[in-house]
Amino acid sequence: MNKILTPQNRQIFFFIVLAYAFSVLCRLDWVWWASGFDEFIYNGKIIINTNDGYAFGEGARDMLAGFHQEGDLSYYGAPLSTLAYLIVKFTPFSLEGVMLYLSAVLSSLIVIPLILIAKTLGAPRAGLCAALLASIAHSYYNRTMVGYFDTDMLNIVLACFIIWGLVRLNAYKDTISALIASLSMLIYFWWYSSSFTLNVALIAMFLLYTLIWHKKEKIYYLTMILMLLAITSIAIWFKILLFALILFLYKSKFYQLSNKQNAIIIALGALIFAIFALSGGLNPIWFQLKFYLLRSTPEKDTLNFIFFNVNQTISESSIIPFGLFSERISSALGVFVLSFVGYVLAIFRHKILLLSLPMCALGFLALFSGLRFTIYAVPFMAFGFGFLLEILGSALNERIKQKSLFLFHLCRFCIYKANLV
């Protein structure tokens, strides 16, 4: 108990509560604004402001009713609809209330992994600064505000929890960290199936990092095996069963006392990769590359009719100027520049932050593939800003200490001379 209630842990808890409350309160501003317009009121309640939100809400409504009509395209059983259904079923909250406020409650959880990453790296104040900035950066705020009932409310949160698990693994080399990273990826893939490409990029980056700096650490390879299993297209109950079996084997005396640990890890990795490949694991990667990177031109059929690619007709997929790009990520061009400098310095100081590159790269893809991607760069660019402030603050404190020490010795010298006189 005393270990849990250390001064540092109390400080981290205070930082998390402060940043979370700040994030939620900032999002409530939309409620006060919308309540002043009759167009946003229906049956005495504020309505949500996204089209997709009503589709997810319909799915939750049908789940509460226990049925839906065949062919009605209901989001019955969708992860967000399922979560809303469970909250309404087992709490006193109404479906309308859940649809309105859930985004503010869940998206504000972004502050937790950012602060915990900073704590693990020994810079908790940088984490607090990053949490405060990331929670209200234009891109993240706009896509997670009250009334924005969409999967975006957890997309970035879960990705950051994955990276926190890997940062923690790098510090402690324990199975708890491996579980944090792999279970976060499991939930992320269930929550948002389009996260597959980012998850693959995170695994690939972690593999590269491991081969360069930690190629003899077996716990790293175990974590990669579990992460790959998490994004395999098989039943979730079967994944959880395999998770348990793999961890049981890793902790067993059979493995711990074996002189063929490397062979066992390789065999496990080959087995999981085979399941991954046979379940169609490479197909989504190719689809995403075609859709976002190979931004071709209109598709043509044999009769020469021209059809625009979908990503050419969606405003979120439109190419944006650099000024708007920087404002979407860091709210201002100057802050963006400082954030970028701080992010580079943070990577030089802590190589493990290289694992955040896939998220930032996806965010920077917005320059070519549309503003919808800027949200991915928000948390770690904000971390870069916080880290830069941490460095500047430490340098300033050191100068103040040096000046204070100089003044102290100067005073001693003056007093000494005065006594001589």
Enumerate the language-model features and the residues they cover.
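Alpha-helical transmembrane segments at the extracellular/periplasmic loop-to-helix junctions
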Residues: 237-244, 273-356
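Start-transfer (signal-anchor) and selected internal transmembrane alpha helices
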Residues: 1-42, 120, 127-128, 245-273, ...
